[in-house]
């Protein structure tokens, strides 16, 4: 498939713009105005463990996906799984990211020491809502499955669900910590 120079330039400009927007968001979300989030030593250890669990989750899910592809091929039906490998693989990546995020939240390592937690919650909520809206609009226009394959709307929905679950896990963890602090304060 040959691309024209205009398409290539458009893709590169879009990537550059997204990088700049991401840097601006990180700067806004950190108390010190830096792009990089800082973590203490305990948080770094927890983050490493979270990455390990996320990696093994992804590896196991990819094995399951490969088995499903083989089983589907053996039955001569190459419909939804093989024609949707891109969105399904992306979904597995989202699940592994979710494992990392929830593990980090649960062990107090998700928010860096220089993060403005409230700003990050707002950013995550906006990203989640935008993705859910984009996914819902695309599904209303074209459907979730097009010509036997999952549509791009599936990816938006997965990103939106990721943000909702991360925010839900953060809220639950905050409630547990608040109750624990209240109980310790009463003693």
Give the ranges of each region predicted by the language model.
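N-terminal topogenic module of multi-pass integral membrane proteins
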Residues: 1-59, 71-75
């Amino acid at each position: 498939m040959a691309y024209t120079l205009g398409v290539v330039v458009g893709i590169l400009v879009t990537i550059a713009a997204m990088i700049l927007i991401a840097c601006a968001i990180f700067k806004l979300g950190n108390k010190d105005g830096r792009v990089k989030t800082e973590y203490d030593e305990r948080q770094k250890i927890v983050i490493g463990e979270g990455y390990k669990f996320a990696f093994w989750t992804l590896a196991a899910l990819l094995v399951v996906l490969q088995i499903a592809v083989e089983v589907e091929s053996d039955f001569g039906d190459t419909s939804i799984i093989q024609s949707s490998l891109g969105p399904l693989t992306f979904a597995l990546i989202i699940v592994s990211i979710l494992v990392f995020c929830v593990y980090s939240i649960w062990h107090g390592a998700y928010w860096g020491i220089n993060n403005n937690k409230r700003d990050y919650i707002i950013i995550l909520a906006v990203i989640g809502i935008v993705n859910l809206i984009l996914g819902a609009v695309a599904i209303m226009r074209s459907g979730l499955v097009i010509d036997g394959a999952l549509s791009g709307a599936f990816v938006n929905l997965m990103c939106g669900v990721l943000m909702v679950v991360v925010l839900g896990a953060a809220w639950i963890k905050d409630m547990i910590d608040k109750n624990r602090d209240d109980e310790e304060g009463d003693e």
